[in-house]
């Protein structure tokens, strides 16, 4: 029983430090913004960079952040979580690199931040299981 109580006390102390850890991640302590997820699965036609950019005036009064899908090239129409290039090709199923930059710029002018959805351990290959394209980092 004594061991159980010590374990519970340790957990309670750890939980007590969670608010301190959460506030140390760069967010203002009284942040009141709301984030919009600007995509859903297989939404590459509905959530093109140009379509999201055209909605900036409608979004600005209500949202401080827009979460957008990843922007790397994946070799075809997909959500892009099998991307081939992380650093050298930003032409994705959602539009071109220039359209992405334009959307981010417009959002910034309207006071909207942009957060990219990136799954760093997902990567597609060119031909087979281990044939990753080379990139310059």
Question: What is each of the regions a protein language model found here?
Answer:
Residues 1-9:
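Bacterial N-terminal signal peptides that target proteins for export
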Residues 24-137:
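Substrate-binding/active-site clefts of carbohydrate-active enzymes
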């Amino acid at each position: 029983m004594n061991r159980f109580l010590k374990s519970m006390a340790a957990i309670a102390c750890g939980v007590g430090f969670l608010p301190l850890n959460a506030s140390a991640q760069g967010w203002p302590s009284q942040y009141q913004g709301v984030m919009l997820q600007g995509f859903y699965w297989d939404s590459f036609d509905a959530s093109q960079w140009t379509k999201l950019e055209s909605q900036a005036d409608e979004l600005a009064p209500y949202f401080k952040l827009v979460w957008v899908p990843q922007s790397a090239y994946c070799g075809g129409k997909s959500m892009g979580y099998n991307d081939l290039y992380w650093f050298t090709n930003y032409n994705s199923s959602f539009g071109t690199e220039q359209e992405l930059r334009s959307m981010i710029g417009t959002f910034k002018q309207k006071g909207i931040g942009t957060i990219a959805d990136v799954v760093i351990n997902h990567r597609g290959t060119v031909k087979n299981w281990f044939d990753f394209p080379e990139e310059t980092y």
